[in-house]
Amino acid sequence: MEIKILERKDNLVEIELINEDHSLPNLLKDILLTKEGVKMASYSIDHPLLHPETGRYISNPKITIITEEGTDPLEVLKEGLRDIIKMCDTLLDELKEKK
């Protein structure tokens, strides 16, 4: 997965996820909204049309995070991604126990 930082300020970061769909940004947004110090977390795909040959969106998802003063939006983003990894690890462990 490729990521591009579009804008970076003390309390704001906007990133673009290259060749991704709604799956990760939607989950990440929901997790970020539960984090202390996060004022706003959202994502958008500017143009929802799919490319006929690749099946990918013509536009890439953009995630925007705005935090309260003293909260680094990139650190909150990393924390949210680690939370997703933990969720997946927990699910994998539960599936192993079901064998």
Curated annotation (Swiss-Prot):
Protein family membership: Belongs to the archaeal Rpo11/eukaryotic RPB11/RPC19 RNA polymerase subunit family.
Lineage of the organism: Archaea, Methanobacteriati, Methanobacteriota, Methanomada group, Methanococci
NCBIfam families: PRK01146.1-2
Main localisation: cytoplasm
UniProt entry tagged with the keyword Transcription: yes
Protein name per UniProt: DNA-directed RNA polymerase subunit Rpo11
UniProt key word Cytoplasm: yes
PROSITE patterns (UniProt xref): RNA_POL_L_13KD
GO CC annotation terms, alphabetical: cytoplasm; DNA-directed RNA polymerase complex
Primary gene name: rpo11
PANTHER family hit by this protein: DNA-DIRECTED RNA POLYMERASE I,II,III (PTHR13946), DNA-DIRECTED RNA POLYMERASES I AND III SUBUNIT RPAC2 (PTHR13946:SF28)
Organism: Methanocaldococcus jannaschii (strain ATCC 43067 / DSM 2661 / JAL-1 / JCM 10045 / NBRC 100440) (Methanococcus jannaschii)
